[in-house]
Curated annotation (Swiss-Prot):
EC numbers, comma separated: 2.7.7.3
Organism: Nitrobacter winogradskyi (strain ATCC 25391 / DSM 10237 / CIP 104748 / NCIMB 11846 / Nb-255)
Catalysis: reaction(s): (R)-4'-phosphopantetheine + ATP + H(+) = 3'-dephospho-CoA + diphosphate
Positions marked as site (Transition state stabilizer): 18
Alphabetical keyword list: ATP-binding, Coenzyme A biosynthesis, Cytoplasm, Magnesium, Nucleotide-binding, Nucleotidyltransferase, Transferase
Cross-referenced InterPro entries: Cyt_trans-like, PPAT, Rossmann-like_a/b/a_fold
Protein name: Phosphopantetheine adenylyltransferase
Cofactors: Mg(2+)
GO CC annotations, alphabetized: cytoplasm
């Protein structure tokens, strides 16, 4: 039975931290599905279609190189429902620090109660990407700063275009 993993997130924007998680995740599964969350209460910088396209462009080559099947989807329901929809039994979550662990453990516990067949796997961030957050990247970009150390080149270009003023 193939190991199918779902890596959910808003990916607004895709960061080098997300890329780091994908590099680890493709070694853990036979098929990785990146799920771009669409939340009605949030106003993302990039549309769901833009985030999906960036995620596919950045992550798919990593999966292909690792011999891991790959797909990107959007979802607007519970993460465990999205996992069931695509046949995933593994949820991949990245951890930067203890604060992330505390938060993610709560979510993992709730998810396990709702879907005992879906298991959360935590991937610790590599040291070089631990300080990166999409929130900080957005703040730097909106203020005209250089985000290239924190995001893939494609994303840096898209952010420059988005916030060119």
């Amino acid at each position: 039975m193939p190991r199918v993993a779902l890596y959910p997130g808003s990916f607004d924007p895709v960061t080098n931290g997300h890329l780091d998680v994908v590099r680890h995740a493709v070694a853990l599964c036979d098929r990785l599905i990146v799920a771009v969350g669409v939340h009605p209460g949030k106003t993302p910088v990039f549309s769901a279609d833009d985030r999906l396209a960036m995620a596919r462009s950045v992550f798919e080559p990593v999966a292909v190189e690792a011999g891991c099947a790959f797909d990107c989807v959007t979802y607007d329901d519970l993460t465990v429902a999205a996992a069931h929809k695509v046949g995933a039994t593994i949820l991949v979550r990245g951890l930067r620090d203890g604060t992330d662990l505390d938060y993610e453990m709560q979510i993992a516990g709730m998810n396990e109660t709702m879907a005992p067949d879906v298991h959360t796997v935590f991937v610790p961030a590599s040291p070089g990407v631990r300080p990166i957050t999409a929130t900080l990247v957005r703040q730097i970009a909106t203020m005209g700063g250089d985000v290239s150390p924190f995001v893939p080149q494609l994303v840096a270009s898209r952010l420059r275009t988005k916030f060119a003023g």
